[in-house]
């Protein structure tokens, strides 16, 4: 878990800062929330800068992530120490706790953890899904046949129904509805590994275009992760596989911007 990861890096001589970043909060085309870890070896230039700052100042003013993606404090600061071996932490850390001790923003240095909630600060414009859609003719394979529309609607819709498990157990299944078709005036939902498949799905995107209702193309999925066009187009790589690859990827715009800041910090 999170504590084991931090302690492992601490044992290897790293200080760590982290932030949960939703790419769409900073003007990117996909709502994809991921934890970004930055580790600084004790002999590195950034580590020495970190040591001169306080943990709270690093997280809210001086740090690499804060100088890439601005955020403001949204909770009290929590501090604690990781000082046990990995086995003990794995077996006993926060046992019985009802919530994680780690917030969406934090750092660890010499086993001392500082963590707090933050919220994103961004004054630019969002990037809507419609801005990355292909302009030309899209292959017929991506359009949803009318015969499959009822199944798409069922899967995307709200449900409260009895189901029977493989061993005969009857249980109540319920879930809320999803927007269908997807709203192209907002950043996309998180794309997943099954995005490239053809069958009706609750989680695949479906957009209404002037030519009909269709799924997203591999090119559009690449753009949602901010890869170059046709980055995954190779002989023998199917469209389904290309969708799978993008479902496993990060929004590289986040990584690129953090990398640019790291470069500046190391000059």
Sequence positions of predicted segments:
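Class I S-adenosyl-L-methionine
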Residues: 1-180
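C-terminal target-recognition/interaction regions appended to catalytic cores
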Residues: 107-267
């Amino acid at each position: 878990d999170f504590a084991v990861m931090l302690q492992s890096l601490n044992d290897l001589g790293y200080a760590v800062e982290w932030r949960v970043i939703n790419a769409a909060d900073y003007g990117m085309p996909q709502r994809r929330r991921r934890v970004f870890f930055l580790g600084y070896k004790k002999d590195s230039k950034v580590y020495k800068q970190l040591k001169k700052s306080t943990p709270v100042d690093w997280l809210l003013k001086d740090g690499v992530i804060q100088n890439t993606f601005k955020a403001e404090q949204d909770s009290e600061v929590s501090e604690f120490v990781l000082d046990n071996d990995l086995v003990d932490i794995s077996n006993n850390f926060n046992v019985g706790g009802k919530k994680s001790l780690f917030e969406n923003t934090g750092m660890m240095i010499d086993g001392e953890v500082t963590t707090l909630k933050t919220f994103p600060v961004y004054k630019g414009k969002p990037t809507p899904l419609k801005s990355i859609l292909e302009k030309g003719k899209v292959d017929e394979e991506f359009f949803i046949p009318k015969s499959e529309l009822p199944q798409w609607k069922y899967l995307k819709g709200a449900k409260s129904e009895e189901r029977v498990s493989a061993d005969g157990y009857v249980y109540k299944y319920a879930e809320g509805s999803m927007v269908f078709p997807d709203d192209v005036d907002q950043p996309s939902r998180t794309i997943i590994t099954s995005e490239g498949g053809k069958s009706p799905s609750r989680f695949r995107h479906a957009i209404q275009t002037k030519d009909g209702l269709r799924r997203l193309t591999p090119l559009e999925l690449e753009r949602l992760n901010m890869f170059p066009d046709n980055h995954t187009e190779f002989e023998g790589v199917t469209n389904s596989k290309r969708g799978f690859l993008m479902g496993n990827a990060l929004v590289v715009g986040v990584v690129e911007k953090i990398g640019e800041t790291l470069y500046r910090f190391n000059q």
